[in-house]
Amino acid sequence: MRGCFLDISKDDRYLLVGGYHDGRVSLMQLDPVEGTIVGIADGVFHKGMGRCIAERSSRPHVNCVRFTPDQRYVCAVDGGLDQVKLYHMDEDLGKIHNTDILRCQIDSAPKSMRFSDDGRFAYVLCELLNCVNVYRYEERNGEPEFHFLQEITTTDKKDDDICSATAMTISPDGKHLYVVNAGVNSAVIYDIDPETGMLTLNCNSKISGEFPKAVRVFPDNEHFMTLNHENDEICVFKMNYEEHYFLMQGKPLHVGKPNSVAIHKLQQ
């Protein structure tokens, strides 16, 4: 098991691990009181070939794993197979069973997945196609259903060949979706329609950093950070949603090869 992504169930009983190199989805049992790992409850290796058998990236690569908001299913985003594999989650037995496949566009390389705060909409970021796919999520007759709503680009058409959509997050208030692109080194902010879940471009601008690998929004919903892997720094920006621009706040923070980050608001 060589994990690259984690997700924890709402009841703190299970931990999902996504394996990029081995294409494995692992379900770990947790002690909900101590927070320690009890053991491996279940695991599944993805199989198959993707875009081209001559390319290394065509093999299964699990980039992201998520519990659905209702905690009934597991979503495993596989960038090598251009799929999101869907598993039924048996909480009592600690087992996952394949139930369906959400097929993305050919050569899209899905990278990340997020759900809206109300659990009605899902967003899938595609690394090679440089787009966000929007879906309406619901459970029907005991099965998960994802209804495609929208595909929206993360970059200008002229930059497609040098752009790679790398990370995505949603602001704490659920009103905005953020994406960062490597190659063109930009941050893109979208407004989320609360009724339809669809996205509208608010701002697209450079971040003055190389190869952003992560983006996170602070609890005030205005400030956000990018982790710029190639020049060893974290940059903080302030977003102006009404005027459609953001500005850097202070000097970059030097951190060696930053890769991921979590923000936790402390209680006063």
What are these regions, as identified by a protein language model?
Residues 1-63:
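Asp-box/WD-like beta-propeller blade repeats and closely related beta-sheet repeat scaffolds
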Residues 163-196, 204-229:
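Loop/turn-rich, solvent-exposed surfaces of beta-rich toroidal or solenoidal domains
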Residues 11-13, 70-72, 118-120, 173-175, ...:
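Short coil/turn segments that connect the beta-strands within blades of beta-propeller domains
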Residues 41-57, 101, 147-160, 253-267:
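Surface-exposed loop and turn segments in beta-propeller and other repeat-based domains
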Residues 17-20, 68, 76-79, 116, ...:
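Conserved beta-strand positions in repeat-built beta-propeller and related beta-rich domains
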Residues 27-38, 88-95, 135-145, 190-197, ...:
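Short loop/turn segments immediately following beta-strands, especially the blade-tip
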